[in-house]
Amino acid sequence: MSFNAKDMTQGGQIASMRIRMFSQIANIMLYCLFIFFWILIGLVLWVKISWQTFINGCIYWWCTSLEGMRDLIKSQPVYEIQYYGKTFRMNAAQVLHDKYMIWCGEQLWSAFVLASVVALVICLITFFVVSWILGRQGKQQSENEVTGGRQLTDNPKDVARMLKKDGKDSDIRIGDLPIIRDSEIQNFCLHGTVGAGKSEVIRRLANYARQRGDMVVIYDRSGEFVKSYYDPSIDKILNPLDARCAAWDLWKECLTQPDFDNTANTLIPMGTKEDPFWQGSGRTIFAEAAYLMRNDPNRSYSKLVDTLLSIKIEKLRTFLRNSPAANLVEEKIEKTAISIRAVLTNYVKAIRYLQGIEHNGDPFTIRDWMRGVREDQKNGWLFISSNADTHASLKPVISMWLSIAIRGLLAMGENRNRRVWFFCDELPTLHKLPDLVEILPEARKFGGCYVFGIQSYAQLEDIYGEKAAATLFDVMNTRAFFRSPSHKIAEFAAGEIGEKEHLKASEQYSYGADPVRDGVSTGKDMERQTLVSYSDIQSLPDLTCYVTLPGPYPAVKLSLKYQARPKVAPEFIPRDINPEMENRLSAVLAAREAEGRQMASLFEPEVASGEDVTQAEQPQQPQQPQQPQQPQQPQQPQQPQQPQQPVSSVINDKKSDAGVSVPAGGIEQELKMKPEEEMEQQLPPGISESGEVVDMAAYEAWQQENHPDIQQHMQRREEVNINVHRERGEDVEPGDDF
């Protein structure tokens, strides 16, 4: 409320102008309706009675109206009455008493009453119709006119009716919104921050998959899906640290050399803008070593890890002879070979968690499990799980398994009627899956249904690169956008939801003291704008999202309710691991990491200061006499059990991930290498000639004294080669050119 004189003047002028304009329209409407009313009466009378009856009835009612004044008229008028071709002359008294004239008057009156009622009803209907038409036209002038783009609705039932009318509604629903029939093979993308509701959508889709008996491969990072869906009678779990883990056999899974190459590509991800020589070489060595071990009757994961990491470089060179990897461990480039093995250690050490799972029952392969799909009965699920404590250590193995499952879909043969679901929440928490970019566009022909959850599109770009991320995102047709707190990500989501093109209405008033100056002008301007603003995305509550369907259907603002599911199985059951084997492998890994740190120092520029050179030579003096005696100690195999040697646990292995330094280049000639003899003389105390840690306390004391900051430095160097940051355009993986 405002008592300001200016506001009152403006409001009064506008109100007065509106009343005047309304009066003009009302007068025109009433005038037209009045004329229309009498026209209707005349038409009804013309249809209802004859002309003779109408004239005679009019004469009768005329005489009736003049009956009170008849005595005042000196000369009584005479009326000519028509009666079927004859003419009779009557005065007023005769007209009023003649039965025929009375009948004509009654007929005229009854016809007039009927005509009036009919005309009034028609006029009222006409009034409302005209008012509605005028109001509709006025509303259209003041409303925006949509000319293109996508629409937005907050009522999913409206879209459900549209889909049902088109015959495209599916039995799969997300809340009250059905998806388009058979669009599940066109994949799903769930985009939004943590805790916004992506997992709830996955649960809704998983419920339908379980009801229909579809085959499902699900990446369960927290064990929530194992807890809610695991059925031990038909389902399988792949988690090296879970007692229920299937006895996965690498050598039965990979039958050919390309199979081992594909496995190595995921197990050892390619670096960022660093020289890809190191990761590529590590891939080659792993693939060739695993392939050569396929015919070994005593093959095992622990033996594979020993072969790659424990034996001397000379023995590894002998094992890989006559293979493409032999050139990478040549004696001429032994220092480079040691550095390559240091890189290999960082990723292959995840294989050590598989030691012992071959005793968990019959050998299991993902390929054979997927080929066993049945369309006449319910199929099982494959849970590839981990938890927050172990995910960093198991990340290479989990990524490898999921990549094998994705490739395994193609081995099942084309079948558009089959449904194989891949649920992968928080996809960027895995290594880059190289085959995903190429397989995802073709998976629909094999019945593949991919449901990926990501916190932001930027994560996808960081892992897969700009072009590959765009390719992946483009083949995910059904999308749900949950809350995104940051401006750029929310703006991206708003742009993906869509925009509309419309003519925006505008209205302007002009008024003054003279009514001639009063007026209203309206107009429309072409405008394009997003359906929702980035602020709308930022302010979405939990379990609320915008859903876009493929095709000409509106975007839907959808609100879900959390549906609790009963716990049907423990999310995690720890597996008993051989402590002696684990301790021995931990010692091997520690030795390889120490070796990697030694090699990293060889790839650093020489120190110009004489004082630093003297300091670098100091460790040789007190420990040198003891080095030759270390390998001959009889207690050497029991060293991992000494209390001075810390044994890394299976669950908490994150610290060892940062212990290997990865050289930034792959051209040995460009690096200043130290003489081999000097390297051998500089072995720290506690390290044998074979590179094994035999006295951890002495080695740690030497490291703390001489290299107090090397661990932090090596950790930063290692993190460079893990997919944390990516410069766009530097990706060398296949599929990036899409």
Curated annotation (Swiss-Prot):
Membrane-related topology note: Multi-pass membrane protein
Region (Disordered): 607-690
Region (10 X 3 AA tandem repeats of [QE]-Q-P): 617-646
Domain of life where this protein originates: Bacteria
One Pfam family from the record: TraD_N
Residues that span the membrane, as ranges: 28-44, 113-129, 396-413
Keyword Hydrolase assigned: no
GO MF, any single term: ATP binding
Subcellular location: Cell inner membrane
Entry-linked CDD domains: TrwB_TraG_TraD_VirD4
Keywords, alphabetical: ATP-binding, Cell inner membrane, Cell membrane, Conjugation, Membrane, Nucleotide-binding, Plasmid, Repeat, Transmembrane, Transmembrane helix
Binding site for ATP: G192, T193, V194, G195, A196, G197, K198, S199
Functional summary from the UniProt entry: Conjugative DNA transfer (CDT) is the unidirectional transfer of ssDNA plasmid from a donor to a recipient cell. It is the central mechanism by which antibiotic resistance and virulence factors are propagated in bacterial populations. Couples the transferosome to a type IV secretion system. Probably forms a pore through which single-stranded plasmid DNA is transferred to the secretion system. Plasmid specificity is conferred by the TraD-TraM pair.
The protein, known as: Coupling protein TraD
Gene: traD
